[in-house]
């Protein structure tokens, strides 16, 4: 048993310490073997041997705890030395990159602000008028349904799009107006391409009637999409939105397959990226504007980020998996 103490004294790390412990105190260790020998003894000889085993076992356990404490302190000191940072040296610490959503937001803002668009920020909590009625969304519109919108008890709601910011801006300012707004929006969806909270960016331009035409809208959108995606092809399609008339949706040539056809573009070669149109007169009437015209556009920031970062699952943006976030 003195050999166990001698082995313990020579231990230099946690691995060796564990090996000595198992050899001494394990189910097949030295002390277990000694206790098994008691069954072959009898009388006073058995009691004396048992007392001796307990004495040595207690001595070993005490020495083991002391050695364990010393080893842990030594290993901690060595680890701290390795992890020590010399603040006088050049900063070689790896810094994180911008989150894909922040990168996308900043890139959008960098395009529009030099063109004279003012960035407006609005409240996340809205009322029915600013979120629905002023935007020509009738009472029977499915977007008003409890299954699609988060409502509060006082008839307030979490905005379902950033369009209410446009309404507030028109109420607080007079034409000419040139603004963009971006931020969080909320809807009752959660799957590969939808999350309960997502980000939108919208733009609005309003001036005296006749000063703003669809050609102005088309020019801005085409310049932006070529700036953001590079040399992609564009396709305009007529569409319907209650708050714009006429309305259009814009597609870009698939950035994944170069229009050869893939699962992402449903083998069509095209990807939808935004909606736009000339502001419906019903919206201007709700605000109290007269003799004005304007255009508006809107797009999902996650949608743009998914295309540029080639991400298939929208939920990846909101999960804290560093392996995913560090890959961008």
Swiss-Prot record:
Gene Ontology cellular-component terms listed: cytoplasm
Cofactor mode of binding and number, as noted: Binds 2 magnesium ions per tetramer.
Subunit and partners: Tetramer of two alpha and two beta subunits.
Catalysed reaction equations from the record: tRNA(Phe) + L-phenylalanine + ATP = L-phenylalanyl-tRNA(Phe) + AMP + diphosphate + H(+)
UniProt source species: Helicobacter pylori (strain P12)
Top enzyme class: ligase
Family: Belongs to the class-II aminoacyl-tRNA synthetase family. Phe-tRNA synthetase alpha subunit type 1 subfamily.
InterPro entries, per the entry: aa-tRNA-synth_II, aa-tRNA-synth_II/BPL/LPL, Phe-tRNA-synth_IIc_asu, Phe-tRNA_ligase_II_N, Phe_tRNA_ligase_alpha1_bac, Phenylalanyl-tRNA_Synthase, tRNA-bd_arm
Entry binding sites for Mg(2+): 245
GO biological process: phenylalanyl-tRNA aminoacylation
Stored HAMAP family: Phe_tRNA_synth_alpha1 (MF_00281)
Pfam families cross-referenced by the UniProt entry: Phe_tRNA-synt_N (PF02912), tRNA-synt_2d (PF01409)
Cofactor(s) needed by this chain: Mg(2+)
Superkingdom classification of source: Bacteria
Keyword annotations: Aminoacyl-tRNA synthetase, ATP-binding, Cytoplasm, Ligase, Magnesium, Metal-binding, Nucleotide-binding, Protein biosynthesis
Identification of the protein by name: Phenylalanine--tRNA ligase alpha subunit
Compartments (UniProt record): Cytoplasm
One Gene Ontology term of the molecular function aspect: tRNA binding
Enzyme Commission numbers on file: 6.1.1.20
């Amino acid at each position: 048993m003195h050999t166990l103490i001698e082995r313990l004294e020579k231990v230099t790390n946690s691995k060796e310490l564990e090996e000595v412990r198992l050899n001494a105190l394990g189910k097949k260790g030295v002390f277990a073997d000694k206790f098994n020998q008691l069954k072959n003894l009898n009388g006073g000889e058995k009691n004396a041997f048992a007392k001796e085993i307990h004495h040595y076992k207690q001595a070993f356990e005490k020495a083991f705890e002391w050695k364990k404490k010393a080893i842990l302190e030594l290993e901690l000191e060595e680890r701290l030395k390795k992890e020590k940072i010399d603040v006088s040296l050049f900063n070689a610490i790896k810094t994180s990159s911008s989150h894909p959503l922040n990168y996308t937001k900043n890139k959008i803002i960098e395009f529009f602000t030099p063109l004279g668009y003012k960035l407006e920020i609005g409240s996340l909590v809205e009322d029915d008028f600013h979120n629905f009625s002023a935007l020509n969304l009738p009472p029977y519109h499915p977007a008003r349904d409890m299954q699609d919108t988060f409502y509060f008890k006082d008839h307030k709601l979490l905005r379902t799009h950033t369009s209410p910011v446009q309404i507030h801006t028109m109420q607080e300012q007079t034409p000419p107006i040139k603004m963009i707004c971006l931020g969080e929006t909320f809807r009752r969806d959660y799957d590969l391409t939808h999350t309960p909270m997502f980000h939108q960016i919208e733009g609005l331009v309003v001036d005296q009637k006749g000063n703003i035409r669809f050609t102005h809208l088309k020019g801005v959108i085409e310049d932006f999409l070529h700036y953001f995606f590079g040399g992609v092809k564009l396709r305009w399609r007529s569409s319907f939105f209650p708050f714009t008339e006429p309305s259009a949706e814009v597609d870009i040539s698939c950035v994944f397959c170069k229009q050869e056809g893939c699962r992402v573009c449903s083998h069509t070669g095209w990807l939808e990226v935004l909606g736009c149109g000339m502001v419906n007169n019903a919206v201007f009437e709700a605000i109290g504007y007269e003799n004005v015209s304007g255009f508006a556009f809107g797009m999902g920031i996650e949608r743009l980020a998914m295309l540029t970062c080639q991400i298939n699952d929208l939920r990846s943006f909101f999960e804290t998996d560093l392996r995913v976030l560090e890959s961008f």
